[in-house]
Structures are given as structure tokens and as C-alpha cells.
Design a protein with these regions (language model features):
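Structured beta-strand/loop patches that form or line metal/cofactor-binding pockets in enzymes
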Residues: 26-28
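Intrinsically disordered, low-complexity boundary segments flanking structured domains
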Residues: 1-2, 15
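Feature captures the catalytic cores and cofactor-binding loops of soluble hydro-lyases/lyases
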Residues: 22, 31-46, 50-120
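Short, structural beta-strand-to-alpha-helix junction motif
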Residues: 2-4, 97
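Short secondary-structure junctions
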Residues: 12-18
Length: 120
């Protein structure tokens, strides 16, 4: 299984707020609309977004998101950092684009899962 810590290390991500870095990451959800994340994300997913305001932390807590990943070198707002520290939500950031990170994470997550049995 893939952890937040392993992803941060392998991709050279800057960890801005250290929540539980041992959390499992089972998938990835990419969206900048909070309502979309609320409706469609799943427990233990990594959320990739451009959003930097404190509401992303609230959504991450409600949805059981393993960590937040901010792209394009975006820094979280000071209030977001404070809220994430209080809620123990990991926030990471990268200078990479959302597209680049999506591709890298897809490969990492796919490679970490056991092979599925095909037809006999």
C-alpha cells in the first residue's frame, strides 16, 4: 500500500503541514470545486487542487481525504495552515502542474496495487 509519506518522498513534495503521513492513499481526486469533491471523492484519496483557502481543510476532514496536494507552486493561505494544523490534515505542495502530478500519481498508485486476475 502507498502512504502519504512515500508519495511526498518519491515526488519531492514540500510538506507544509504534517498530519498523519502514514495514511494510506488508495486513489486520487482532482478538482477545484468543493461541491464536486464533497459529492465524488472517497476515503483515503489524495486531493489535488489549486485552491488554497481554509475550506479545503474542512472538506478534507469531512470526506476522509488522506492529504491535500497544491499544484503550480501555490502556497496555502495562513488561515489554511492554521486550520490544517488544528485538524491534523497534511498539506503538500509542488511546482509541478496538475497534469504532471496526475500522471505521476496514477503510475505510482497503479504500481502499488496487486495485479488483478484476468479471465481464465
Amino acid at each position: 500500500m502507498l502512504t502519504v509519506s512515500a508519495i511526498a518522498e518519491k515526488l519531492g513534495l514540500k510538506v507544509v503541514v504534517k498530519g498523519d503521513l502514514s495514511q494510506i492513499v488508495s486513489g486520487c481526486y482532482i478538482s477545484d470545486l468543493l461541491s464536486d469533491v464533497m459529492a465524488h471523492s472517497k476515503d483515503h484519496e489524495l486531493w489535488i487542487t489549486l485552491q488554497t483557502h481554509p475550506n479545503i481543510v474542512a472538506v478534507a476532514v469531512i470526506k476522509g481525504i488522506s492529504a491535500l496536494l497544491l499544484t503550480n507552486g501555490r502556497n496555502p493561505e495562513p488561515a489554511t495552515i492554521k486550520k490544517a494544523e488544528a485538524e491534523k490534515v497534511t498539506i503538500m505542495m509542488s511546482a509541478h502542474t496538475t497534469f504532471e502530478l496526475a500522471g505521476l500519481l496514477y503510475s505510482m498508485i497503479k504500481d502499488s496495487q496487486p495485479p488483478q486476475a484476468g479471465p481464465s
